[in-house]
Amino acid sequence: MVEAFCATWKLADSHNFDEYMKALGVGFAMRQVGNVTKPTVIISSEGDKVVIRTQSTFKNTEISFKLGEEFDETTPDDRNCKSVVTLDGDKLVHVQKWDGKETNFVREIKDGRMVMTLTFGDVVAVRHYEKA
């Protein structure tokens, strides 16, 4: 089912992302960059691993993981997390844990777009991606 996500995705629109970054403790300057950056996300399946590459004018990141197995992740805002990604029906669920905190991203395909819902506490942001 992860194959449905395997594509190159370009950010089309974003809602409440600044509030989400603020809740995470991201500083003002980095939030300003985060708000104007339109990343390209490339999701691929390589053997038993899933690879998510995020490319932008600000920073490029790459994570490689097996579904359901914890891995170490350094986020674009330099948090060191223990992360796990699972498939829950038709949703790709990504949980990051650090310093006693937890955030999650749920990616799903709706009408040919990838919808990413980011949740930290009671703050929710939604980002829509279109195939590039």
Curated annotation (Swiss-Prot):
One family name in Pfam for this protein: Lipocalin
Q: Where is the protein situated, by its record's location annotation?
A: Cytoplasm
UniProt keyword annotation of Heme present = no
The UniProt entry lists the main location of this chain as: cytoplasm
Where is a fatty acid annotated to bind?
R127, H128, Y129
Residues modified as N-acetylvaline: V2
- Top-level taxon in the UniProt lineage: Eukaryota
- UniProt entry tagged with the keyword RNA-binding: no
Q: Which GO terms describe its molecular function?
A: fatty acid binding; transcription factor binding
- What GO CC terms are in its UniProt record? cytosol; nucleus
Q: Which GO terms describe its biological process?
A: brain development; fatty acid transport; neural retina development
Q: Which of UniProt's keywords are assigned here?
A: Acetylation, Cytoplasm, Lipid-binding, Transport
Give the family per the record.
Belongs to the calycin superfamily. Fatty-acid binding protein (FABP) family.
- Free-text domain note: Forms a beta-barrel structure that accommodates hydrophobic ligands in its interior.
In UniProt terms, what function does this protein have?
FABPs are thought to play a role in the intracellular transport of long-chain fatty acids and their acyl-CoA esters.
Name listed for the protein in its UniProt record: Fatty acid-binding protein, brain
Q: From which organism does this entry originate? A: Gallus gallus
